[in-house]
């Protein structure tokens, strides 16, 4: 009440925005006579002039009136269409990074060309995002003549596109594509092994068509890239025969002919020299290793991992202690609680090794390698805007989540559609019969076309069956074949047309009263001018007949949970001032009525003693349904907002990893990185044997020497150093060992040569980063699955999630460093041929990725995780918890005085 009173005095925010924008429109219109007088060549030459002015420091806002006037004049000459003033307002809205709500049929596609043209002048690229490939291709081809006349390049991206073609499309001034493809390309770009393989050149400015569908309905849809599950079952089965031929060494330090020694504390195994030789011979006999080839050559490290997993499976993991067999599957037993953990799987190939040991079918892993949500992807753009026919009902969410204001653009002509009250029936059968009867009544009265919107395919089939029984010809759409869908929707305004469509089908294509004569002309082979004149004359007659019959009739077979979806269906009729009628038919059995409409409405209808074919029509009922829809919308918004808090944690970690990956790819040499890794790993390793601030009696020097020998392949006389220099403390020891290890690494590096060493370093760093990031994603999923239970312990699940996620992230960084240092220390110096083979393997690995597109349940905090879960036990060391700072250049919260990227955020 108060809000409407204030709005009446001062005007609403939307009215104030429109008033401001109309002044800019006046400036554009004032330029029209001058711009119209330009020749085609002079008009086209305006684009390089604008680009030069922009490069000289003039802002796009300053260029806007003249650029819009040029774009409008070019559209008039090339496309035969002139932008209305309301379309200019829409273009200003898009340029300012807002959402333009424009009614169906008001020309959103043409409106978008204004903001595209202006923002393309910066040279940073504009992305136009649509809901399907057909619309992307259609809009790109429709606008291509205009943009090419103005000297701008245009590209389209789609799935399974040739890499060179896709790269060229991204280099174009304006790039069209679907939300899925843009999102997948972002993920793929962060899995490449050289900067030259990247396709996207930055996320500068995006215009999202049907923005409500993408940013609200699909907000939590995860884009997932998963590794094609390589069928390694034969490898696990073959290597499973090796462990029974081996025996453990009883003591780590005493060579007694054993093939490996067991570290039960760390649940790891290390092979002895005899073990290496034995395993190599076995692998050669199996044909898995070439004669004379080393197990520790760079290209064979995967075999080392397989053998290690097989030995661990046989000697460290016992049936009915660490796992049980149930229905032919290995189920992990939690060692702390004794409970089984269905759905969880050990990582690093251990689970498959246990399956091979038990003679079970080896389950391939289709692991998530990269994932993001549309919510997080689109928030990466420097400037984001969108257009739709229905966004005002979700304006609060658009503002809070994405920082986007919604501006309602007035219609070019007044809206005269007749939106009638809902009719409510006792049951679905009564409702469907009433719909069929209404269709027959409309057909008897004239030639008005009818569009029936359904919420489900099942409802479409029921109505289609009843229409067939009544002998009424009709079309059915289910939003699967986009091109056919658009064609049928385009003709859905023809006289006597009856079309059944799911509520979302055919979005982006206008329903023209009388049908679309241009689409009919395009289907003819070699059409003549006579054909064109005939079809146009026929359309003019059909158009007039449909107008006289009251325009398009919309019949909704039920209400959706969201008012916005209902408004989309209604918005099919009444385009550009055309007449039209809309009405929803409901029943007490509809989900929304059954769950949300309230007992009062249901009780009232039952008390009236209505029969199946009788309906109630009252504003109170319609209001009650709208109130129910508002409650559902508010609940869904709260769920999305709450889940976004958790997603934001993952998103920050993703940005750090991807940024680090780009830095690695951009560096010519990683020597400085790798040497720093050596120092950090040495510090952590030494701390395991020489605890900080401990006395000499607590030092396990022998254990440290063995660890250096086994993990890094380096013999250091640590005990001798201590005996020679009694003043050598813990800090001095760390420095001396680090210097020795790095000196040895530099020696090996010199033997390889700078170029080969740089390639090997990049190979191991990227491989380790990608492998552990994949495992980290699974661990984060598992953490999230049960985090809500912390609420029962009077803890804040959100804070607990942030704390645990940070610990997991820091631990992952530590494991990556350890892996890189260990692999680089133990790998045999590769030949140029082996390096080339490694590079080829990397490329094969990149090409073996497959895409998987899934919907995530919005209530994902309590739902089961369908992906295989990775063990969280890989890094059990307690870590101090610090919050992740907003910027990687901010001081690290640990208090070290270093930047975060050089401290806890460093790889």
From Swiss-Prot:
Cited InterPro entries: Helicase_ATP-bd, Helicase_C-like, P-loop_NTPase, SEC_C_motif, SecA, SecA_CS, SecA_DEAD, SecA_motor_DEAD
Molecular function terms, GO-annotated: ATP binding; metal ion binding; protein-exporting ATPase activity
Cofactor binding annotation: May bind 1 zinc ion per subunit.
One example of a Gene Ontology biological process annotation: intracellular protein transmembrane transport
Top-tier EC class: translocase
Catalytic reactions on record: ATP + H2O + cellular proteinSide 1 = ADP + phosphate + cellular proteinSide 2
Cellular compartment(s): Cell inner membrane; Cytoplasm
One Gene Ontology term, aspect cellular component: plasma membrane
Lineage top rank: taxon: Bacteria
Required cofactor(s): Zn(2+)
Subunit relationships: Monomer and homodimer. Part of the essential Sec protein translocation apparatus which comprises SecA, SecYEG and auxiliary proteins SecDF-YajC and YidC.
Name assigned to this protein: Protein translocase subunit SecA
């Amino acid at each position: 009440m108060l809000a409407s009173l204030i709005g009446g005095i001062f005007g609403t925010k939307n009215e104030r925005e429109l008033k401001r924008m109309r002044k800019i429109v006046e400036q554009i219109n004032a330029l029209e006579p001058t711009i119209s007088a330009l020749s085609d060549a002079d008009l086209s030459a305006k684009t390089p002039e604008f680009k030069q002015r922009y490069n000289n420091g003039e802002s796009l806002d300053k260029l806007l009136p003249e650029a819009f006037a040029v774009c409008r004049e070019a559209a008039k000459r090339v496309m035969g269409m002139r932008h209305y003033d309301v379309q200019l307002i829409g273009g200003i809205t898009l340029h300012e990074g807002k959402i333009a709500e424009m009614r169906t049929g008001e020309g959103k596609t043409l409106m978008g060309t204004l903001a595209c043209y202006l923002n393309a002048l910066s040279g940073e690229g504009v992305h136009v995002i649509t809901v399907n490939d057909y619309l992307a291709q259609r809009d790109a081809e429709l606008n291509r003549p205009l943009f090419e006349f103005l000297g701008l390049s245009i590209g389209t991206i789609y799935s399974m596109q040739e890499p060179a073609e896709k790269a060229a499309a991204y280099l174009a001034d304006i790039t069209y594509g679907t939300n899925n493809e843009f999102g997948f390309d972002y993920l793929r770009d962060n899995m490449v092994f050289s900067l030259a393989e990247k396709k996207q050149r930055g996320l500068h400015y995006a215009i999202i068509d049907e923005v409500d569908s993408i940013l609200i309905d699909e907000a939590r849809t995860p884009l997932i890239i998963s590794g094609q599950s390589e069928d390694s079952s034969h490898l696990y089965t073959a290597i499973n025969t090796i462990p029974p031929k081996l025996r453990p060494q009883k003591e780590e330090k005493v060579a007694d002919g054993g093939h490996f020694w067991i570290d039960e504390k760390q649940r790891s195994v290390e092979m002895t020299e005899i073990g290496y030789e034995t395993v190599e011979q076995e692998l050669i006999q199996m044909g898995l290793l070439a004669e004379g080839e080393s197990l520790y050559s760079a290209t064979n490290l995967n075999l080392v991992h397989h053998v290690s997993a097989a030995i661990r499976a046989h000697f460290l993991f016992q049936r009915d202690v660490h796992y049980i067999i149930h229905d032919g599957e290995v189920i992990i037993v939690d060692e702390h609680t004794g409970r089984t953990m269905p759905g969880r799987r050990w990582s690093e190939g251990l689970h498959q090794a246990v399956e091979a040991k038990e003679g079970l079918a080896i389950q391939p892993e289709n692991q998530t390698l990269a994932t993001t949500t549309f919510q997080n992807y689109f928030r990466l753009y420097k400037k984001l805007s969108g257009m739709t026919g229905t966004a005002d009902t979700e304006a609060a969410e658009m503002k809070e989540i994405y920082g986007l204001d919604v501006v309602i653009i007035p219609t070019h002509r007044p809206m005269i559609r007749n939106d009638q009250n809902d009719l409510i029936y006792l049951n679905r059968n009564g409702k469907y019969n009433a719909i069929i009867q209404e269709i027959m009544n409309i057909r008897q009265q004239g030639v008005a076309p009818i569009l029936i919107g359904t919420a489900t395919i099942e409802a479409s089939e029921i109505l289609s069956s009843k229409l067939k029984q009544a002998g009424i010809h009709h079309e059915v759409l289910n939003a699967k074949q986009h091109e056919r869908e658009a064609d049928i929707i385009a003709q859905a305004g023809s006289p006597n047309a009856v079309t059944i469509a799911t509520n979302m089908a055919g979005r982006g294509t206008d329903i023209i009263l009388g049908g679309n004569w241009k689409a009919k002309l395009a289907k003819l082979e070699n059409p003549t001018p006579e054909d064109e004149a005939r079809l146009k004359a026929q359309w003019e007659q059909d158009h007039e007949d449909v107008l006289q019959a009251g325009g398009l009739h919309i019949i909704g077979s039920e209400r959706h949970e969201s008012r916005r979806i209902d408004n989309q269906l209604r918005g099919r009729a009444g385009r550009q001032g055309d007449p039209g009628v809309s009405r929803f038919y409901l029943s007490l059995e509809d989900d929304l009525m059954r769950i949300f409409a309230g007992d009062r409405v249901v009780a009232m209808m039952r008390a009236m003693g209505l029969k199946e074919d009788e309906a109630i029509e009252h504003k109170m009922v319609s209001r009650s349904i709208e109130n129910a829809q508002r409650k559902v919308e508010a609940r869904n918004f709260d769920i999305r907002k709450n889940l976004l808090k958790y997603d934001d944690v993952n998103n920050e970690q993703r940005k750090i990893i991807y940024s680090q990956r780009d830095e690695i790819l951009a560096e010519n040499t990683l020597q400085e990185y790798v040497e720093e890794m050596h120092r950090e790993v040495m510090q952590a390793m030494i701390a395991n044997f020489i605890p900080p601030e401990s006395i000499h009696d607590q030092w396990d020097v022998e254990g440290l020497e063995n660890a250096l020998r086994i993990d890094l392949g380096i013999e250091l006389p640590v005990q001798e150093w201590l005996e020679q220099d009694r003043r050598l403390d813990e800090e001095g020891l760390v420095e001396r060992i680090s210097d020795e290890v790095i000196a040895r690494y530099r020696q090996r590096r010199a033997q390889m040569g700078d170029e080969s060493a740089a390639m090997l370093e990049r190979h191991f760093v990227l491989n380790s980063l990608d492998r552990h990031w994949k495992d980290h994603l699974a661990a984060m999923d598992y953490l999230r699955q049960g985090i809500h239970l912390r609420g029962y312990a009077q803890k804040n699940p959100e804070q607990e999630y942030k704390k645990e996620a940070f610990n997991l992230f820091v631990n992952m960084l530590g494991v990556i460093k350890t892996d890189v240092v260990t692999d680089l220390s133990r790998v045999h110096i590769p030949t140029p041929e082996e390096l080339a083979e490694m590079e080829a393997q990397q490329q094969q690995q990149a090409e073996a990725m497959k895409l998987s597109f899934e919907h995530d349940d919005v209530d994902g905090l309590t739902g089961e995780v369908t992906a295989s879960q990775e063990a969280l036990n890989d890094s059990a060391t307690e870590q101090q918890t610090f919050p992740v700072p907003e910027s990687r250049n901010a001081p690290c919260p640990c208090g070290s005085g270093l930047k975060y990227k050089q401290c806890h955020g460093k790889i």
